[in-house]
Amino acid sequence: MGRFLNSIIPYASYEETCTDDYFVDKSLLIDELIPALSKKNRFLCITRPRRFGKSVMANMIGAFFGNVKDSRNIFQNLAISKSPNFSKHLNRHKIIYIDFSRFPRNCTSYEQYINRIQDGINQDLSLAYPDLTIEIGDAVSVSYTHLT
């Protein structure tokens, strides 16, 4: 479990969200995303205006697909549990989770912030895949090509 790769944060955050009195089940969005997993351009960017639930959606996606912790207890009573894709994809994927809403105190520029994220992802990849040669200073795209 790393800071970015296979982070526990999406699971913990979504588990807390599901217990909220005003929780609305939007888990069928996951079923809409599943076909994209088999595409060459399978990387997704979800954009919405402020306060439209982007973080909740990102946490839901990470909690569902991520394989850090069994999230069946969260999703078994949600709409996605009735999908034929439920068991096929629940907790079966590695995820990279980045929260852009928190700018660390020790970062003084956007460039430094992005470098910190790239270095963190590379460190996580190095720990998860010790047989690969991943340099901490490499761009994440370079590290990704080593994995595929």
Task: Locate predicted features.
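N-terminal pre-Walker A segment at the start of P-loop NTPase domains
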Residues: I9-D31
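Hydrophobic anchor at the beta1->P-loop junction of P-loop NTPases
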Residues: I46
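Conserved small/polar residues in nucleotide/adenosyl-binding loops
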Residues: T145-T148
